[in-house]
From Swiss-Prot:
Protein name: Cytokinesis defective protein 7
Biased composition (Basic and acidic residues): 258-267
Name of a matching Pfam family: BTB
InterPro entries, sorted: BTB/POZ_dom (IPR000210), SKP1/BTB/POZ_sf (IPR011333)
Source lineage: Eukaryota, Metazoa, Ecdysozoa, Nematoda, Chromadorea
Amino acid sequence: MSDNLSARWHRILDMTNRETSDDVVIARSSFDDFSQSTPWRKFEISCGNRSFFVNPGWLAELSPYFADELYVRKPNVQRYVIDQATPDEVLEFLRCITFCPMRKPLTVKNVSLVLTFANRFEMRPVQARCENFIAQNATSLSRDKTKLFQFFPLQVTCAMSQCDPNSSTMSVLVDKLAGIKDDELSRLHFAEMPGDVVAEVYAQKIQRTKDKKAQRQAGASDETAAGCCFMQWASSLFNRRRQRNQADQSILPPSGDQQHHRSELHA
């Protein structure tokens, strides 16, 4: 895979009439820092005191927001400022959405950050990747739910609620949260979550309590029914035995008649 990317890189350099250099090396585990402008990455994204150079067409492919911003509203602008973020956060985000030459994989440490940016810039393909990653790991991690949210902090649930609050992945996360005791939730800073998520979690908790109560009542009803069946069976058996004994006794003559019969035989 890396060799194919390297060959592609050299072909691009040849197409732009630039001499290939031994300095151009594609390592198997390296990720670009986007600090240098190239003929195909001229668009500048500024954050704080750092600049990142990206392919605007790729941003437009991923994001309707950038497609409108860069090619409709401001087609001649060559710079975009991202605020409310740090340069390191922007760099991590770009590395996770761009093949330059390799795309950085999602991890439990960066998925919340990437999903937050993807929500902000309406990047549905990136949102889908993040959602799939969260769903796979939420179901495969330990059954210890507090351990789960040590790997997936509550920020992931917050980001998912902004992405698609009705998704199956969101349902999995809410179900996991509903299974955590209240005192453990407080240690996870649960109160900092959006109000609609908190309400959904507690609604799930209430429903769980009702379901458990219904199961206990159903179990008690089954035990009562089983006891009634046993009593009916025992009573029926007792009645049959009593009726049989009464029938046997009716066949034999009374004790007085037996003695009179014996005296007649001896005479």
